[in-house]
From Swiss-Prot:
It holds the Pfam family TetR_N. The keyword tRNA processing does not apply. Residues 37-56 bind DNA. One of its GO terms (molecular function) is DNA binding. It comes from Staphylococcus aureus (strain MRSA252). Keywords: DNA-binding, Transcription, Transcription regulation. The keyword Protein biosynthesis does not apply. Residues 12-74 form the HTH tetR-type domain. SUPFAM superfamilies: Homeodomain-like. This is HTH-type transcriptional regulator SAR0097.
Amino acid sequence: MEKNQRKKRSDAEYNQQIILTTMEDLLEQGEDISTKKMSDIAKISGVGVGTLYRHFESKTLLCQAIMDKKVDQMFIEIEDILAENTQWPVRDKINVILTKYLDLKEANFTTLNFIEKSSSHSSSVINIPFFERLKNLLIQQFENVHSIADLDFKLNLMLNAFSSDFYYFVKHNQKLTKQQFLDKLLDLYLK
């Protein structure tokens, strides 16, 4: 009996990995999986629809799972850079954090946009699962350095400037580069 349970768990882990790997491959090829039906995703992955739903109750959860490794890698890179550069001014540290986040956002724009918009009726960066982790990392940079009134409110406001809709507008309509966008934003909060 125990051997059967392990085999079932092994099969389940295998199926989950197949689904994630297939979707990651599609994303790398430029496919927008947010437009695909769950039945199509199951078919493309070579699993049954029931198997797909056992692992991921919704397309949003599937997209979040796809992003989990990428998000963790982003935070590892940020923490490594910050650890190596403890003497940097707060602005430089925050610039690195937000640059790394924008790198992730630009590389996975449609997926993060889908997560933002499907998490609630409002389109907000607050809806991304790692929002609090990102905000807490920013808060840490201010500890013992700057006293900013209403820091929590200001960071919520600042991070909402990273919503997919607004960032797309800034990049494509106002023609700002990533660094120009960050400089203008940081000037508002850190001058």
